[in-house]
Amino acid sequence: MNANKNKGKSFERFVAKHLSSVFNLNFERIPNSGAYVGGKNVSRASKLTEEQLLLCDGDIIVPKELSHICFECKWYKEFSWQKLFKNKGESHLNKWIEQTEVTTKRMWFIIFRINRQGEFVCFSSDYNVTFPGSYFECKINDKFYSIASLDNFFESNIGYMLRICS
């Protein structure tokens, strides 16, 4: 197995452990995650039940209490932050958002780590979340997205996320 796949899997495990700790619920990395219903395989989703989709949508298996939420995980060496100040956005982020919006109908969060820069969370600016610190809003293809530090983000939004899923 190549180093990049191992790096991605370890970050997915990190995110699952972090979310489990925050929500006091069980989150697990999806075994063999990697676009089972995403990308070229998006047509598979129409054949699956809601329960089956929970097991293969995103990179993290969510507990039933948060079944309306999808988590994608990414770990990259570099990220061109300066490109976010242009309406075109950053190529990695653009691709992640496009893939996520095509493959899931649920509320989604893209959690990503950039080497030597930290962990961040990206999501639609339409969500009514609380920001525990500063955040950045960018416009990509005429839609607005927010990016915030992962630090205390989900801790600050436990109630909101559980409410929208009930």
Predicted regions and their residues:
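Short beta-strand-loop-alpha-helix junction that forms the active-site gateway
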Residues: 3, 73-90
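Anionic group-transfer/hydrolysis microenvironments
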Residues: 59-61, 74-76, 80, 115, ...
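Acidic-basic catalytic patches of nuclease active cores, encompassing PD-(D/E)XK
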Residues: 1-47
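Structural alpha-beta junctions
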Residues: 20, 24-25, 102-108
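Active-site beta-strand-loop-beta-strand hairpin of nuclease catalytic cores
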Residues: 23, 56-70, 78
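Nucleic-acid nuclease catalytic cores
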Residues: 103-130
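Intrinsically disordered, low-complexity terminal regions enriched in charged/polar residues
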Residues: 126-166
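Well-ordered, non-membrane alpha-helical segments in soluble/globular domains
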Residues: 89-100
